Amino acid sequence: MAVYTDVAADELADFLSQYDLGELLSYKGIAEGVENSNFLLHTTKGSFILTLYEKRVAKNDLPFFLALMTHLAEHGVNCPLPVKGRDGEALRELSGRPAAIITFLEGVWPRKPNAAHCAGVGEGLARMHLAGANFAIRRANALSVAGWRPLFDAAASRADEVQPGLRAFLAAELDYLASGVWPTNLPEGVIHADLFNDNVFFLGDKLSGIIDFTFACNDMLAYDVAICLNAWCFEPDHSFNVTKARAFLNAYGRVRKLSEAEEAALPLLARGAAIRFLLTRLVDWLNVPPGALVRPKDPLEYVRKLRFHQSVSSVRDYGLMPSGLVA
């Protein structure tokens, strides 16, 4: 979450008059994250999150995100619910941006995830995958293989300013992933596609909610697993923590077992997930709007992660025995 667009108090008051949310007591911008402008609202009827959708989020995708949250909540996934106004609509406009209000979830995101957190995420992700199986609306993943080259092209001329040799490193990896090795026949469904630790809330070691579905789409379920290996199973020094990975994969597998083909593809999917976040971080790093209340994330973190995945030979390196759980 972040703030790119400021909202004046009188604009917000007019906006809230379209809802039955009580009187506004206070509001403040939320600085975390990099995609949209988010505000925490306190009213006489409770706390809510206001999101103004920016940058990569297309307005015609927003009904998908809002309907997905409603569907998942109705199928047992603890996630925010879109709030409808008096006219029955959840999506409207504020400060020239598409905007929506969602319910506030209790909990905090873990700054230092442990193995118990990773297990909670594994179980929660698997339950989300199962709950989304009969969701009728589809949205293609714009940030899969075909979307990586345009991101590279947008940043290539300045990539070596971030790290010497980065442009050539990225080009070589993109050439490999586009050479026909990317899987095409794995189980697909609705994926979160951005399940980092700041998008998962916990109360203690128990997962209390999953948030921020603005990258959700239809893609290989195992790709979502690979994203989480990148997001949850490395230490601050970027070394891979096999204990966390084992906890995550085992917990996922107890709810939804990975197929042999999914297991075999994990190293390749993890490489793809790593370069996807490396590229979007690189573009963001080079293009932060002046004065934005935002902290760009370090793209070089994902250079180190990608190099690790390039060295992986099988799922054993992730703590999982092929076609079976590790005790």
From Swiss-Prot:
GO terms for biological process: threonine biosynthetic process. InterPro entries: Aminoglycoside_PTrfase (IPR002575), Homoserine_kinase_II (IPR005280), Kinase-like_dom_sf (IPR011009), Pseudomonas-type_ThrB (IPR050249). The keyword Kinase applies. Gene3D superfamilies: 3.90.1200.10, Phosphorylase Kinase, domain 1. Pathway: Amino-acid biosynthesis; L-threonine biosynthesis; L-threonine from L-aspartate: step 4/5. It is an enzyme of class 2 (transferase). It catalyses: L-homoserine + ATP = O-phospho-L-homoserine + ADP + H(+). Its EC number is 2.7.1.39. Pfam families: APH. Keywords: Amino-acid biosynthesis, ATP-binding, Kinase, Nucleotide-binding, Threonine biosynthesis, Transferase. GO terms for molecular function: ATP binding; homoserine kinase activity. Belongs to the pseudomonas-type ThrB family. This is Homoserine kinase. It comes from Bradyrhizobium diazoefficiens (strain JCM 10833 / BCRC 13528 / IAM 13628 / NBRC 14792 / USDA 110). The lineage of its organism: Bacteria, Pseudomonadati, Pseudomonadota, Alphaproteobacteria, Hyphomicrobiales. The gene is thrB.
